Amino acid sequence: MSWRSESIWIELRTGSRKTSNFFWAFILFLGSLGFLLVGTSSYLGRNVISLFPSQQIIFFPQGIVMSFYGIAGLFISCYLWCTILWNVGSGYDLFDRKEGIVRIFRWGFPGKSRRIFLRFLMKDIQSIRIEVKEGISARRVLYMEIRGQGAIPLIRTDENFTTREIEQKAAELAYFLRVPIEVF
C-alpha cells in the first residue's frame, strides 16, 4: 500500500503477518505436536491420542526420534509465531522531496535494535537498481543505491512481484526521486 502526493511518497511494508506465515506456523505446530504426542505415547506404552495406535511404535529408536522431531518442530513453530506477533520486517519507506530526506523504518526482533530507522539525503541516492534472476528460484529485488552506504533493499525477496511490476515500481520511484535506473 502506498500514498503519494506531489512532494511525499509513503510506501507501507508488510512484515511477517502474511497469510502464508500464519498457515505454515499453524501446520508446523499441529504436525510437531502430533509427533511429540506419538513419541510420548510410545514411551508411556498407552495411547495418549486415539487416532492411531502407538503401541506399534517402540520407544527406542522410533519414539525418541519422533519426540525429538516434535520438540524441534515446536521450537520452530514458536519462532514463527513470535515473528508474527512482533511483525518483524514491517514498516514504511518515506520519500520527502520538499525536505530532501528519505526515511526507512522497519520493526526488528526485540532488543537494542528493535526499531531500525535509516535516514538519507536525497542527493546521496545514486540510482534505483533492479536485480532480476529468472529460473526455478526466481528472484526480483528492488534496491536503492546510496553513495557511501551501498545498496539498500526496498522490496523483500519473498514478495512475489512479476518482472513487469518490479520495473513499473522502479520506474515510478526513479522518476519521483529523479535518479537513473540500473538493471542487473
Curated annotation (Swiss-Prot):
Signal peptide stretch: none
Keyword ATP-binding assigned: no
Key words of the record: Chloroplast, Membrane, Photosynthesis, Plastid, Thylakoid, Transmembrane, Transmembrane helix
InterPro entries noted in UniProt: PSI_Ycf4_assembly
Top-level taxon of origin: Eukaryota
Spans through the membrane: 22-42, 57-77
Compartments where located: Plastid, Chloroplast thylakoid membrane
Protein's GO biological process: photosynthesis
Keyword Transmembrane helix part of the UniProt annotation: yes
A Pfam match: Ycf4
GO cellular component, one term: chloroplast thylakoid membrane
Topological type in the membrane: Multi-pass membrane protein
PANTHER family named among the record's database cross-references: PHOTOSYSTEM I ASSEMBLY PROTEIN YCF4, PTHR33288
Function description: Seems to be required for the assembly of the photosystem I complex.
Family per similarity comment: Belongs to the Ycf4 family.
Alphabetical list of HAMAP family matching this protein: Ycf4
Name under which the protein is recorded: Photosystem I assembly protein Ycf4
Source organism of this protein record: Aethionema cordifolium
